[in-house]
């Protein structure tokens, strides 16, 4: 299916947010995710299904002082 990931079109076989992260080789522990402009809690990533045309945004947390 085709979705938008961080503003870029992407073809994916992933059906959930967690599967998409793993497909992209991204470490889930340090990420936040939004699906169609709605923040998705980490606990729901495995059960949140992706659909054709969805817009997914991943944000990486960086600590500092």
For the regions a protein language model found, what residue spans apply to each?
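Ubiquitin-like/PB1-type beta-grasp interaction modules and other compact soluble beta-rich domains
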Residues: 1-64
């Amino acid at each position: 299916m085709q979705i938008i990931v961080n503003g870029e079109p992407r073809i994916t076989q992933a059906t959930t947010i967690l599967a998409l992260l793993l497909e992209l080789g991204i470490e889930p522990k340090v990420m936040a995710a939004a699906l169609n402009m709605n923040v998705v809690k980490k606990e729901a990533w495995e059960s949140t299904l992706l659909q054709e045309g969805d817009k997914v945004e991943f944000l990486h947390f960086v600590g500092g002082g």
